[in-house]
Design a protein with these regions (language model features):
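Short, low-complexity intrinsically disordered segments enriched in A/P/G/S/L with frequent Arg
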Residues: 7-12
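Short hydrophobic transmembrane-like helices used for membrane targeting/insertion
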Residues: 1-2, 26
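Multi-pass alpha-helical transmembrane bundle typical of ion/small-solute transporters
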Residues: 19-223
Length: 223
């Protein structure tokens, strides 16, 4: 004899078996819902690869085209046309590459995350999407204080989001190398942005110091 959840016996006929099977499937679905755990961060890899790839490609979109020259350009013409955009392109491309590497390394270190971490990762990816916009402005008006500060502030936001995500990924685990590698660019970009507000042409040299983040992490690990 089959007993219903209310405690009343059911007839051992077709109706009773259907009732039991239906409620058993409901109970199984409830147990499955309770077993849903943290989000698998590896699912973000394909999305992040696409976003980084498109953003890093669009960095070259604002480079001057051949149509800007009325005649065959001289070396001086080429330098005047391409110097500033290429400087901005190289800084942004290397920065994006470093953060792409850091992003994938972080997903490997912390393969699971909460909804909040997933949402923060999406905000981080949005900041990467916007990089071609600020890069285009900086390439055209590199010596302008307002544009230089805007570009530096954007780099600082990207670095800060990356560092925050590393803090969340490493919570409860002290790893000086990884934390230093993530935090170092934040201070470099912040200092460079302050300098950009005062002496815009010097800021680009300070921002390039962020490329030494892996070295800073390596030195921190050896102490």
């Amino acid at each position: 004899m089959i007993w219903a959840p209310s405690g009343r016996p059911l007839r051992a006929d077709g109706f009773a078996w259907r009732y039991h099977a239906r409620h058993e499937s409901v109970f199984e679905r409830g147990a499955t819902l309770q077993q849903i755990g943290p989000f698998e961060m590896r699912r973000l890899k394909a999305l992040s690869n696409t976003i980084f790839g498109v953003a890093m490609t669009l960095l070259a979109y604002d480079l001057p085209k051949a149509s800007v020259f009325k005649d065959a350009p001289t070396w001086i013409d080429l330098v005047r046309a391409y110097a500033q955009p290429l400087i901005a392109l190289m800084i942004s491309f290397i920065v994006a590459g470093l953060f792409w590497f850091s992003h994938h390394r972080r997903l490997s270190v912390a393969p699971e995350g909460s909804r909040g971490e997933v949402f923060l990762n999406l905000i981080f990816l949005v900041s990467i999407i916007i990089l071609p916009v600020t890069n285009g402005l900086y390439g055209a008006y590199r010596l302008d204080g307002v544009v230089a500060v805007l570009y530096g502030a954007h780099l600082t936001v990207i670095a800060t989001l990356n560092a925050l995500l590393w803090f969340l990924a490493l919570r409860g685990r002290g790893n000086r190398e990884l934390l230093t590698t993530a935090i170092y660019p934040v201070f470099v970009f912040l200092i460079g942005t302050v300098v950009a507000a005062i002496v815009p042409p010097i800021a680009q040299f300070i921002w390039c110091l962020a490329f030494g983040a892996p070295l800073a992490g390596w030195m921190a690990a050896r102490r």
